[in-house]
Amino acid sequence: MRLERALRARQLIPLAAIWLLVGCGKQETVESTAVPPEVGVYTVKAQALTLTTDLPGRTSAYRVSEVRPQASGILQKRMFVEGAEVKQGEQLYQIDPRTYEALLARAEASLLTAQNLARRYERLLDTNAISQQQYDDAMATWKQAQAEAQMARINMQYTKVLAPITGRIGRSAVTEGALVTNGQAQELATVTQLDPIYVDVNQPITRLLGLKRALESGRLQRVGDNQAQVSLTLDDGTPYPLKGVLKFSEVSVAPSTGSVTLRAEFPNPDHKLLPGMFVHALLNEGEQQAAILVPHQAVGRDARGVPTVWVVKPDNTVESREVQTLQTVGNAWLLGAGINDGERVITEGVQLARSGITVKPVAAKNVKLMSEFGSQVQAQAH
């Protein structure tokens, strides 16, 4: 009985082996005939890229002059319309001139007396009728009288309060009949020059130092005369039609904010910009000749937090690659390293990607970088 069971077991072993081999062959056939997953890819194109930075700022007047009297007296008349444009040298107020007219008349009379005495002494000196000292005293008195008469004329002119600069004048702080004094603390009015107008913006010093390093290393090139041009957007999103020019930057860093103040000058013929307005200034930073841009959705992060992308190699196999993200540019990342021109990165079906698998790459849908539309891109610090 035992012998019969042993013979049967020997007969079943080859059959089981054959069955296992057939089953494995079927599994290999199924695996070999599996369809590769379809993924959307974006083909990277190196391109010239002009980088700009968006900085908040405020407008400030080109010139501001507070009008104060240089003569004392009763204000007789205001001679301008509040809020109107005034020209330099235009009369704004009239101070009662009668006191100064009398002082001028007395000074001119004293001048005439001193002049006649000096001329008379000059003739007497020729005949030795007076001493040289008497003649010198008479000449000094004449010159002093000339100076006093000139001062009286100046004070007389000061009764007419003139506009110190051309610009728009604000409200009058005094009315007719008010007593004003020479050099008083309160201004009579303020004249503001609005054309051109300044825009002051603050740039973080870390960003400024990074740009300098990029320019020194050659990663960024200056864009010629356009680097000094500044574009402006109003607080409501309306673009300002005229370009400005970057004038200077402060030589010191604000300790509280760690930023440097930059000043730009804008033409303002229609007075659309008023002092104190909040605006956004777009400054040219530089140009990168062969910039590598990839869509935001192509970049992920691994468990260590390192930026990575899935790259489809020429044989359609997938590879995970670490990249260096420099900054965002519109709807894309500007890369410093990791991806080369012409390589394909996965933007759709990223969840299907695994290292080493074969995929079916197709052109990704609805993936367009802002720079490909020809619009000027905007850079933000990363």
Curated annotation (Swiss-Prot):
GO biological process: response to antibiotic
Inducing factors: The ttgDEF operon is induced in the presence of toluene and styrene, but not m-xylene.
MF terms (GO), sorted A to Z: transmembrane transporter activity
Alphabetical UniProt keywords: Cell inner membrane, Cell membrane, Coiled coil, Lipoprotein, Membrane, Palmitate, Signal, Transport
Subcellular location: Cell inner membrane
Range of residues in the leader sequence: 1-23
Lipidation (S-diacylglycerol cysteine): C24
Lipidation (N-palmitoyl cysteine): C24
GO-annotated cellular components: plasma membrane
Membrane topology field: Lipid-anchor
Coiled-coil stretches: 100-136
Domain of life: Bacteria
Family named by the database record: Belongs to the membrane fusion protein (MFP) (TC 8.A.1) family.
Functional note: The periplasmic linker protein component of an inducible organic solvent efflux pump. Involved in export of toluene and styrene but not of m-xylene, propylbenzene or ethylbenzene. Is not involved in antibiotic or AMP efflux.
PANTHER family for the chain: ACRA/E-RELATED COMPONENT OF DRUG EFFLUX TRANSPORTER, MULTIDRUG EFFLUX PUMP SUBUNIT ACRA-RELATED
Record protein name field: Toluene efflux pump periplasmic linker protein TtgD
